[in-house]
Amino acid sequence: MSHQPLSCLTEKGDSSCETPGNGPSNMVHPNLDTFTPEELLQQMKELLVENHQLKEAMKLNNQAMKGRFEELSAWTEKQKEERQLFEIQSKEAKERLKALSHENERLKEELGKLKEKSERPFEDITGRCGFPRTDLEQEVEQLKRQVEQEVEHLKIQVRRLQAEKADLLGIVSELQLKLNSGGSSEDSFVEIRMTEGEAEGAMKEMRNSAGPTRTDSISMGKCTEDARTCVEFEELTVSQLLLCLREGNQKVERLEIALREAKERISDFEKKANGHSAIETQTEGSTQKEEEDKDPESVGIEVETLNVQVASLFKELQEAHTKLSEAELMKKRLQEKCQALERKNSATPSELNEKQELVYSNRKLELQVESMRSEIKMEQAKTEEEKSRLATLQATHDKLLQEHNKALRTIEELTKQQAEKVDKVQLQELSEKLELAEQALASKQLQMDEMKQTIAKQEEDLETMAVLRAQMEVYCSDFHAERAAREKIHEEKEQLALQLAILLKENNDFEDGGSRQSLMEMQCRHGARTSDSDQQAYLFQRGAEDMSWQHGQQPRSIPIHSCPKCGEVLPDIDTLQIHVMDCII
């Protein structure tokens, strides 16, 4: 904030403009002769302290305005979220309508098939009749869940309204405290104005030592403007509170409408549940009827609790309206006080510029608030459109449910008529199946007896096999021992045979050498020589006789490979092993 200087000093020390920079010219100033310089300094210090306090109050008001703006932005975000929830609910309702339409078409197709096949015997009617009943039960459960979800949603909205109401009541109480302290602030403003006049008179007398005091007088002028801005901010806060309370009233009205719609839906669902319970008592019995009667009772209790909450909300809203009227009265009083202050204080050009800036900023804020309101209205219109769509979807849903119920009734009637015809055929078929089952059981019992006998025989065979295996192990061990002993004997016999063969060869060689020497000696003695042919024949015959004699003198070979059990002689050890295994077994 800028102010005109209180005194324009010349080179000689005189003032070129004697008019003060703030305050009217016709205002009577007190005589400064009665005040001492110390008292003037004390008053200046007090004014500085008050100026500092006013600045802090302005900062707090600015922070409060920022908080209000943030709350408004958060509220708009909540509205957007609610709108998204409504859109999701509308989509779900559309999907349910599609599913119901598909089910209705399927039931119509089944009706057509039943009408076409009414002349023929049916075997699987009971299996088909179970599906629509289960579908009906599922739909009833889904509708009950929807009602419970809507009731919970309404409860959440009521809690939100209660919290908002508590916040608004706290804000109103704070404003009342500020307004109660407003009277003392006005008195302080008047005192500030009086001290400003006194300070200006003192400054005219003390021009040479007026360096630091000029800044103090300028700050005094700023205090009045700070007070005006404080009042304007308080007016803005009051107006914003009024808007918030009006919006709260609108929310309560919407909730009342939603509660009425929920009550209507609950009544419709109760009627439908009663209808379904009447149908199910004819088919299933009294147990399910008691379970279905409990659900509407619980829904009715929840509706009564909601009605009580709505009544309490109405009472709280009436109290809020009374507090709003009190706040409006306080606003009028503040406006009157502001007008009185404006009349007292004459505006300078610099103050006018500052006021214009403040007005411009206030208009900007108002435009922002209006834009927010327009957005909120648009969102409210969209939500209302979505509600209307939901209402139309619910109407179509009710129609489809009625058609579904009619189709189910016709199906049940047809199934009852055809069940009476099919009972006799089913009894005959069941009797035949029983006979076949008894025959199959008898044959299976015979097979079981035969299997038991075979199992007993196999167990006996297994026992004998175990004994035989033990005997085989004993025989095998004995056979391996005998085989090892025989192999040793055979090796010894082979060694002896080799030694005999060597000795026989040596003996033959020795005998041949001796016979030749004797022949040579005989030839030399006798000197008679026969012809070569006769001599050769004689020698040949004698050699043959010697060979036969040698063969006659050789020992006969004893049979080695013979069976120990039966005594049969075999040529090889392998054949002997095979024979022994067969002979023992």
Curated annotation (Swiss-Prot):
Region annotated Interaction with MYO6, chain positions: 416-525
Residues carrying Phosphoserine: S188, S209, S346, S531
Matching InterPro entries: CC2-LZ_dom (IPR032419), NEMO_N (IPR021063), NEMO_ZF (IPR034735), Optineurin/NFkB_EssMod (IPR051301)
Protein location: Cytoplasm, Perinuclear region; Golgi apparatus; Golgi apparatus, trans-Golgi network; Cytoplasmic vesicle, Autophagosome
Region described as Interaction with Rab8: spans on this chain: 58-220
Example of a GO biological process term: positive regulation of cell population proliferation
Coiled-coil stretches noted in the UniProt entry, renumbered to this chain: 38-181, 244-512
Positions with a binding annotation for Zn(2+): C563, C566, H579, C583
Polar residues bias: start-end ranges: 16-25
Motif placement: LIR: 187-192
GO molecular function, one term: protein-macromolecule adaptor activity
Positions of region (Interaction with HD): 415-585
Any Pfam family the entry gives: CC2-LZ
GO cellular component terms listed in the entry, alphabetical order: autophagosome; axon; cytoplasm; cytoplasmic vesicle; Golgi apparatus; neuronal cell body; nucleus; perinuclear region of cytoplasm
ZnF CCHC NOA-type span: 555-585
Motif (UBAN): 478-483
Gene3D superfamilies per UniProt: L1 transposable element, trimerization domain, Nemo cc2-lz domain - 1d5 darpin complex
Subunit and partners: Self-associates. Interacts with HD. Interacts with GTF3A. Interacts with MYO6. Interacts (via UBAN) with ubiquitinated TFRC. Interacts with GTP-bound Rab8 (RAB8A and/or RAB8B). Interacts with TBC1D17. Interacts with TBK1. Interacts with TRAF3. Binds to linear ubiquitin chains. Interacts with LC3 family members MAP1LC3A, MAP1LC3B, GABARAP, GABARAPL1 and GABARAPL2; OPTN phosphorylation increases the association (at least with MAP1LC3B). Interacts with RAB12; the interaction may be indirect.
UniProt function note: Plays an important role in the maintenance of the Golgi complex, in membrane trafficking, in exocytosis, through its interaction with myosin VI and Rab8. Links myosin VI to the Golgi complex and plays an important role in Golgi ribbon formation. Negatively regulates the induction of IFNB in response to RNA virus infection. Plays a neuroprotective role in the eye and optic nerve. Probably part of the TNF-alpha signaling pathway that can shift the equilibrium toward induction of cell death.
Notes on the domains: The LIR (LC3-interacting region) motif mediates the interaction with ATG8 family proteins.
Record-linked PANTHER family: NF-KAPPA-B ESSENTIAL MODULATOR, OPTINEURIN
Protein name according to UniProt: Optineurin
Species annotation: Rattus norvegicus (Rat)
